Amino acid sequence: MEPDNSPRKIQFTVPLLEPHLDPEAAEQIRRRRPTPATLVLTSDQSSPEIDEDRIPNSLLKSTLSMSPRQRKKMTRTTPTMKELQTMVEHHLGQQKQGEEPEGATESTGNQESCPPGIPDTGSASRPDTPGTAQKSAESNPKTQEQCGVEPRTEDSSAHMLPLDSQGASLV
């Protein structure tokens, strides 16, 4: 047996940085490079950069600063109702920013959500699928009462009147 060809001995080569950098700058660059653990976290996000203002879960914000060993020990928890509500509000705010003028929204259907006091479990469980809360609210009478959605009739020409924030008709 030759000790030099042992399968346990693995040597990695580190690519050299540009020669015009001083050693201190090269060391700082090396330290800023992501580790495999941080790459796993960033792959779950929608963009390569982690913007702490976009992350609704405060627990995730705190885990980003932890070491990988500390992160391993933590168990994954489901978000609280307050966190779900903020995620839904953030999602609905993004939808309203990209919404068409009022005349065009009638053809797409009513996309109102529940009032802030009533939890909207349909869209909170799937915040990336717009309109699913409306479909589930129409099929479930209890949800219809909570969200103020009237059941659809067979008459396709009937539609709901727009309501203000207190629930009174605007027309």
Curated annotation (Swiss-Prot):
Domain of life: Eukaryota
Keyword set includes Phosphoprotein: yes
Post-translational modification summary for this protein: Phosphorylation of Thr-35 is required for activity.
Keywords of this entry: Acetylation, Carbohydrate metabolism, Glycogen metabolism, Phosphoprotein, Protein phosphatase inhibitor
Residues covered by region (Disordered): 1-171
Annotated segments matching region Interaction with PPP1R15A: 143-171
Biased composition (Polar residues): 122-146
Positions of post-translational Phosphothreonine modification: 35
PANTHER family: PROTEIN PHOSPHATASE 1 REGULATORY SUBUNIT 1A, PROTEIN PHOSPHATASE INHIBITOR AND DOPAMINE- AND CAMP-REGULATED NEURONAL PHOSPHOPROTEIN
Record note on quaternary structure: Interacts with PPP1R15A.
Protein name per the record: Protein phosphatase 1 regulatory subunit 1A
Provenance organism: Mus musculus
